[in-house]
């Protein structure tokens, strides 16, 4: 199994073949990065296996929870600020990270379309490079196995009106719950909406959530400058109070992206200070267009007041204030996009999580195929080199086979213990070739000499050709084995 180091600036991939054994995986105390000595098993149970995404203030990893019956996947988010931030900015960023954990604990376990919180913890570790102690913060949440809607549009193009209407309806139901708890999400956008393998829609990334405590769902404090360019309404960009209607505005812009595949900058007419999204080629029913137009109005009080009201209109009701006029205007979206957290899984391509992850499934999913094949090629060539040397020095079959067997066992053991990796194998093969070049007697196996004579090649060139053939044979064998293993795994997970 390969484990990623989460220390900023390291990110080394560490291989531990013994962790493919389920019993070892669940009983081992700790493993450390071979480069910086960072603990790899976070909080004693979470094993990072893949980087999902990285933003200005955090990184997200796909991880295994080794203390669950199915070895379930989860998302581990690390507070990882970058750039030149002053102490006030760092404190704000950390408070937002902690707030996401609090919100997920409060909301996730109560709504099945919001990820659950599994853990939140600090980690104090020594840095051998500086001699100082570093502190890191981690948040562990449910892994949603799917694709965010931004990537869906990038890959497949705009959605149909029926699909967009479904997304809008599902999101309104989720926001009705969120707003009902007194929270405002403040970062609704396509990359924070994810559809899983079964088609269920989820709302992600609660790092920008703000509690609404005054007025009609309004915050009694100013809003921090945290938003995504093009999706935030004027009141949010100005740092003013935020409302449920703030999220509804961002949801409307999200719907425009899903319908057209175009960004807000492409659909907003800055010269006339209005949205210009209704193109002749875009077929959208008048009722849906009217709902979107009203949600895009610049003043919060002119939009729908709640998600429930929008749902009522979509279901045939009239709402409280009638329809918004076509071509509704709004202030030019300006400001800086300060994205606090990466979307947990939006940066990753859809993964097919096994139904019952275990020793075999994890070995298959986490196997670095190219590295295995390359190391197999180096091993195959090394075995040919040493086989020729053994037979050349000891023509007696039993002795040469014994020596070759010991060499094979030694190489396998050294690779298992990670004493010999790609770099070391390259060095070993290079030194072997130099030895063959310096000592001709090491390559005087009669069959090699005979083959060199037939090919009219120097003996050393013939030896290298034989080594290449051995490398190809090993690579082909490994590739066939991996193919069979993956096919077998695919069949078993569908039973």
Curated annotation (Swiss-Prot):
Keywords: ATP-binding, Kinase, Nucleotide-binding, Serine/threonine-protein kinase, Transferase
EC code(s) of this entry: 2.7.11.1
Active site: 187
Binding site residues for ATP: 52-60, 77
Reactions catalysed: L-seryl-[protein] + ATP = O-phospho-L-seryl-[protein] + ADP + H(+); L-threonyl-[protein] + ATP = O-phospho-L-threonyl-[protein] + ADP + H(+)
CC terms in the record's Gene Ontology section: cytoplasm
Comp. bias regions, Polar residues: 329-350
Protein kinase domain location: 46-314
Region span, Disordered: 316-354
GO molecular function, one term: ATP binding
Cross-referenced InterPro entries: Kinase-like_dom_sf, Prot_kinase_dom, Protein_kinase_ATP_BS
SMART domains in the record: S_TKc
CDD domains: STKc_PknB_like
UniProt xrefs under PANTHER family: SERINE/THREONINE PROTEIN KINASE, SERINE_THREONINE KINASE LIKE DOMAIN CONTAINING 1
Family, per entry: Belongs to the protein kinase superfamily. Ser/Thr protein kinase family.
Record protein name field: Serine/threonine-protein kinase F
Lineage, broadest ranks: Bacteria, Bacillati, Cyanobacteriota, Cyanophyceae, Synechococcales
Encoding gene (name): spkF
